[in-house]
Amino acid sequence: MATTHLDVCAVVPAAGFGRRMQTECPKQYLSIGNQTILEHSVHALLAHPRVKRVVIAISPGDSRFAQLPLANHPQITVVDGGEERADSVLAGLKAAGDAQWVLVHDAARPCLHQDDLARLLALSETSRTGGILAAPVRDTMKRAETGKNAIAHTVDRNGLWHALTPQFFPRELLHDCLTRALNEGATITDEASALEYCGFHPQLVEGRADNIKVTRPEDLALAEFYLTRTIHQENT
């Protein structure tokens, strides 16, 4: 069984563009304060002592990353990402060395709290399949009629969770599940869905709902608020 002293490698797929942000700059390179969103996301991972290395998968044509101080960080490895998220994660896993467990974290999710990360990492003591940070659905959920912006019915929210990141799995298991799912044409929306496809049932670790992913323009101000609040709390 895995123990807490095992080093962890994190993989950050950062090859996407994010057209919903309505900006020419990829969202991970937008700034909050004096750092990019990507830097906030990566530094939150490196703040935990078990995370010894972060592999960042960037677009082969990316000229922005090399301009960041992060590019010269001794714990950072950069690889070329792929067309899809799963391709980028696989590229990152190949560069993860002999790490037995890996975290996968969104490049545009800068508000990760250390207590959430610590509880997720504790799964290596109790689980053989790992798990994800997630938040219970609290809003009323509606399913739309096919092809229409009209309500078909209300979805029972009991047992529904919002999947967050990081997601935390044994490296070899995640590699094998992603490879099989891609080879068989399965729809993979996050890393956990690859394990689900292969018959595994990752754990849900309840995380904070303010661990948001910056996807739309209005998310940027919200992420800035959350980060500013966290910094203020840490300094008081």
Swiss-Prot record:
Keywords on record: Isoprene biosynthesis, Nucleotidyltransferase, Transferase
GO terms, molecular function: 2-C-methyl-D-erythritol 4-phosphate cytidylyltransferase activity
Site-annotated residues for Transition state stabilizer: R20, K27
InterPro entries: IspD (IPR001228), IspD/TarI (IPR034683), IspD/TarI_cytidylyltransf_bact (IPR050088), ISPD_synthase_CS (IPR018294), Nucleotide-diphossugar_trans (IPR029044)
Catalytic activity: 2-C-methyl-D-erythritol 4-phosphate + CTP + H(+) = 4-CDP-2-C-methyl-D-erythritol + diphosphate
Metabolic or biological pathway: Isoprenoid biosynthesis; isopentenyl diphosphate biosynthesis via DXP pathway; isopentenyl diphosphate from 1-deoxy-D-xylulose 5-phosphate: step 2/6
Enzyme Commission number(s): 2.7.7.60
Swiss-Prot/TrEMBL site (Positions MEP for the nucleophilic attack) positions: R157, K213
Gene Ontology terms: biological process: isopentenyl diphosphate biosynthetic process, methylerythritol 4-phosphate pathway
The protein's assembly and partners: Homodimer.
Purpose: Catalyzes the formation of 4-diphosphocytidyl-2-C-methyl-D-erythritol from CTP and 2-C-methyl-D-erythritol 4-phosphate (MEP).
Family that this chain belongs to: Belongs to the IspD/TarI cytidylyltransferase family. IspD subfamily.
HAMAP family reported for this sequence: IspD
Protein name: 2-C-methyl-D-erythritol 4-phosphate cytidylyltransferase
Native source species: Escherichia coli O127:H6 (strain E2348/69 / EPEC)
